[in-house]
Curated annotation (Swiss-Prot):
UniProt gene name: Cmpk1
The protein's name: UMP-CMP kinase
Residues where N6-succinyllysine is found: K106
Species in which this protein is naturally found: Mus musculus (Mouse)
Catalytic activity: CMP + ATP = CDP + ADP; dCMP + ATP = dCDP + ADP; UMP + ATP = UDP + ADP; a 2'-deoxyribonucleoside 5'-diphosphate + ATP = a 2'-deoxyribonucleoside 5'-triphosphate + ADP
Keywords assigned: Acetylation, ATP-binding, Cytoplasm, Isopeptide bond, Kinase, Nucleotide-binding, Nucleus, Phosphoprotein, Pyrimidine biosynthesis, Transferase, Ubl conjugation
Entry note: cofactor: Binds 1 Mg(2+) ion per monomer.
Modified residues (N6-acetyllysine): K43, K55
Length: 196
Protein backbone atom coordinates (compact mmCIF):
# COMPACT_ATOMS: atom_id res chain seq x y z
CA UNK A 1 0.00 0.00 0.00
CA UNK A 2 1.30 3.44 -0.93
CA UNK A 3 1.27 6.38 1.46
CA UNK A 4 -1.53 8.88 0.79
CA UNK A 5 -0.28 12.36 1.50
CA UNK A 6 -1.94 15.69 2.20
CA UNK A 7 0.50 18.62 2.08
CA UNK A 8 -0.37 21.25 4.69
CA UNK A 9 0.89 24.73 3.77
CA UNK A 10 0.51 28.28 5.03
CA UNK A 11 2.66 31.04 6.52
CA UNK A 12 4.32 30.87 9.94
CA UNK A 13 1.61 31.08 12.61
CA UNK A 14 -1.26 30.16 10.29
CA UNK A 15 -2.15 27.36 12.73
CA UNK A 16 -0.89 24.37 10.74
CA UNK A 17 0.29 22.37 13.76
CA UNK A 18 -2.84 23.07 15.81
CA UNK A 19 -5.18 22.00 13.02
CA UNK A 20 -3.08 18.95 12.13
CA UNK A 21 -3.35 17.68 15.71
CA UNK A 22 -7.15 17.82 15.41
CA UNK A 23 -7.19 16.12 12.00
CA UNK A 24 -5.08 13.28 13.46
CA UNK A 25 -7.55 12.86 16.31
CA UNK A 26 -10.66 12.86 14.12
CA UNK A 27 -9.47 11.15 10.93
CA UNK A 28 -6.59 8.92 12.02
CA UNK A 29 -3.91 10.51 9.86
CA UNK A 30 -0.26 10.49 10.94
CA UNK A 31 1.09 14.03 11.26
CA UNK A 32 4.61 14.66 10.01
CA UNK A 33 5.94 18.15 10.51
CA UNK A 34 8.96 18.77 8.31
CA UNK A 35 10.09 21.50 10.72
CA UNK A 36 9.68 19.32 13.80
CA UNK A 37 11.55 16.40 12.24
CA UNK A 38 14.39 18.79 11.43
CA UNK A 39 14.35 20.30 14.93
CA UNK A 40 14.44 16.83 16.52
CA UNK A 41 17.20 15.69 14.20
CA UNK A 42 19.17 18.80 15.09
CA UNK A 43 19.06 17.82 18.79
CA UNK A 44 20.08 14.23 18.11
CA UNK A 45 23.80 13.97 19.00
CA UNK A 46 24.26 10.97 16.68
CA UNK A 47 22.81 12.71 13.64
CA UNK A 48 25.03 13.27 10.64
CA UNK A 49 22.87 16.29 9.76
CA UNK A 50 22.57 18.05 13.14
CA UNK A 51 25.02 20.93 12.78
CA UNK A 52 24.05 21.63 9.20
CA UNK A 53 20.35 21.83 10.12
CA UNK A 54 21.16 24.16 13.03
CA UNK A 55 22.94 26.56 10.70
CA UNK A 56 20.05 26.71 8.20
CA UNK A 57 17.31 27.08 10.82
CA UNK A 58 19.17 29.85 12.65
CA UNK A 59 19.52 31.83 9.43
CA UNK A 60 15.84 31.29 8.57
CA UNK A 61 16.85 29.43 5.42
CA UNK A 62 15.31 26.31 3.91
CA UNK A 63 17.22 23.12 4.74
CA UNK A 64 18.50 21.12 1.72
CA UNK A 65 15.71 18.98 0.31
CA UNK A 66 17.59 15.66 0.45
CA UNK A 67 17.77 15.91 4.24
CA UNK A 68 14.10 16.78 4.69
CA UNK A 69 12.86 14.07 2.31
CA UNK A 70 15.04 11.38 3.84
CA UNK A 71 13.59 12.24 7.28
CA UNK A 72 9.99 12.26 5.96
CA UNK A 73 10.48 8.99 4.10
CA UNK A 74 12.06 7.34 7.16
CA UNK A 75 9.04 8.31 9.28
CA UNK A 76 6.50 7.10 6.70
CA UNK A 77 8.33 3.79 6.26
CA UNK A 78 8.54 3.24 10.03
CA UNK A 79 4.87 4.12 10.58
CA UNK A 80 3.65 1.78 7.84
CA UNK A 81 6.03 -1.00 8.89
CA UNK A 82 4.48 -0.87 12.36
CA UNK A 83 0.91 -0.74 11.02
CA UNK A 84 0.13 -1.23 7.34
CA UNK A 85 -3.31 0.38 7.78
CA UNK A 86 -1.74 3.68 8.78
CA UNK A 87 -1.01 4.94 5.29
CA UNK A 88 -2.56 8.42 5.50
CA UNK A 89 -0.13 11.23 6.24
CA UNK A 90 -0.37 14.96 6.79
CA UNK A 91 2.92 16.56 5.82
CA UNK A 92 3.08 19.98 7.30
CA UNK A 93 5.40 22.76 6.13
CA UNK A 94 6.56 20.96 2.98
CA UNK A 95 7.18 21.44 0.04
CA UNK A 96 8.38 24.96 0.80
CA UNK A 97 9.91 25.84 -2.54
CA UNK A 98 10.51 24.69 -6.10
CA UNK A 99 13.58 22.73 -5.04
CA UNK A 100 11.53 20.85 -2.39
CA UNK A 101 8.85 20.03 -4.93
CA UNK A 102 11.33 18.78 -7.54
CA UNK A 103 13.10 16.72 -4.89
CA UNK A 104 9.80 15.19 -3.79
CA UNK A 105 8.74 14.41 -7.37
CA UNK A 106 12.12 12.85 -8.12
CA UNK A 107 12.37 10.76 -4.94
CA UNK A 108 8.74 9.91 -4.22
CA UNK A 109 7.28 9.61 -7.71
CA UNK A 110 5.28 6.39 -7.80
CA UNK A 111 6.06 5.78 -4.11
CA UNK A 112 3.45 8.12 -2.60
CA UNK A 113 0.26 9.79 -3.81
CA UNK A 114 -0.56 13.40 -3.00
CA UNK A 115 -4.35 13.67 -2.43
CA UNK A 116 -4.50 17.45 -2.12
CA UNK A 117 -2.89 20.52 -0.59
CA UNK A 118 -4.54 22.03 2.48
CA UNK A 119 -3.74 25.75 2.39
CA UNK A 120 -4.20 27.85 5.53
CA UNK A 121 -4.43 31.40 4.24
CA UNK A 122 -3.68 33.99 6.89
CA UNK A 123 -2.92 37.70 7.01
CA UNK A 124 0.82 38.23 7.71
CA UNK A 125 0.32 40.58 10.66
CA UNK A 126 -2.03 38.10 12.38
CA UNK A 127 0.56 35.37 11.79
CA UNK A 128 3.34 37.47 13.32
CA UNK A 129 1.25 38.31 16.40
CA UNK A 130 0.39 34.63 16.92
CA UNK A 131 4.03 33.58 16.65
CA UNK A 132 5.24 36.28 19.04
CA UNK A 133 2.60 35.10 21.51
CA UNK A 134 3.73 31.48 21.00
CA UNK A 135 7.38 32.50 21.34
CA UNK A 136 6.78 33.53 24.95
CA UNK A 137 6.21 29.89 25.87
CA UNK A 138 7.52 27.76 23.00
CA UNK A 139 11.21 28.42 23.47
CA UNK A 140 11.55 28.31 19.67
CA UNK A 141 14.60 30.33 18.68
CA UNK A 142 12.86 31.49 15.50
CA UNK A 143 9.72 32.96 17.14
CA UNK A 144 11.03 36.53 17.26
CA UNK A 145 10.02 39.42 15.01
CA UNK A 146 13.22 39.57 12.98
CA UNK A 147 13.25 35.83 12.25
CA UNK A 148 9.52 35.95 11.56
CA UNK A 149 9.74 38.70 9.00
CA UNK A 150 12.46 36.72 7.24
CA UNK A 151 10.32 33.57 7.40
CA UNK A 152 7.28 35.36 5.97
CA UNK A 153 9.44 36.81 3.21
CA UNK A 154 10.76 33.31 2.42
CA UNK A 155 7.21 31.97 2.48
CA UNK A 156 5.91 34.62 0.07
CA UNK A 157 8.84 34.25 -2.33
CA UNK A 158 9.21 30.47 -2.23
CA UNK A 159 6.15 28.67 -0.88
CA UNK A 160 3.33 30.76 -2.29
CA UNK A 161 4.35 29.92 -5.91
CA UNK A 162 4.15 26.19 -5.01
CA UNK A 163 0.60 26.68 -3.72
CA UNK A 164 -0.25 28.53 -6.95
CA UNK A 165 1.18 25.64 -8.96
CA UNK A 166 -1.03 23.09 -7.17
CA UNK A 167 -3.93 25.53 -7.53
CA UNK A 168 -3.56 25.29 -11.32
CA UNK A 169 -3.79 21.49 -11.00
CA UNK A 170 -7.03 21.89 -9.02
CA UNK A 171 -5.44 20.31 -5.95
CA UNK A 172 -5.69 23.13 -3.41
CA UNK A 173 -8.28 23.33 -0.61
CA UNK A 174 -8.04 26.84 0.78
CA UNK A 175 -9.10 27.86 4.28
CA UNK A 176 -9.28 31.30 5.87
CA UNK A 177 -6.98 30.72 8.84
CA UNK A 178 -7.42 34.14 10.43
CA UNK A 179 -10.58 32.94 12.24
CA UNK A 180 -10.71 31.18 15.60
CA UNK A 181 -9.29 27.66 15.98
CA UNK A 182 -12.79 26.14 16.16
CA UNK A 183 -14.09 28.03 13.14
CA UNK A 184 -11.05 27.01 11.11
CA UNK A 185 -11.49 23.38 12.14
CA UNK A 186 -15.14 23.56 11.07
CA UNK A 187 -13.90 24.33 7.55
CA UNK A 188 -11.28 21.57 7.76
CA UNK A 189 -13.95 19.02 8.69
CA UNK A 190 -16.04 19.92 5.63
CA UNK A 191 -13.04 19.19 3.40
CA UNK A 192 -12.00 15.92 5.08
CA UNK A 193 -15.55 14.59 5.28
CA UNK A 194 -15.70 14.96 1.51
CA UNK A 195 -12.11 13.97 0.62
CA UNK A 196 -11.39 11.60 3.44
Amino acid sequence: MKPLVVFVLGGPGAGKGTQCARIVEKYGYTHLSAGELLRDERKNPDSQYGELIEKYIKEGKIVPVEITISLLKREMDQTMAANAQKNKFLIDGFPRNQDNLQGWNKTMDGKADVSFVLFFDCNNEICIERCLERGKSSGRSDDNRESLEKRIQTYLESTKPIIDLYEEMGKVKKIDASKSVDEVFGEVVKIFDKEG
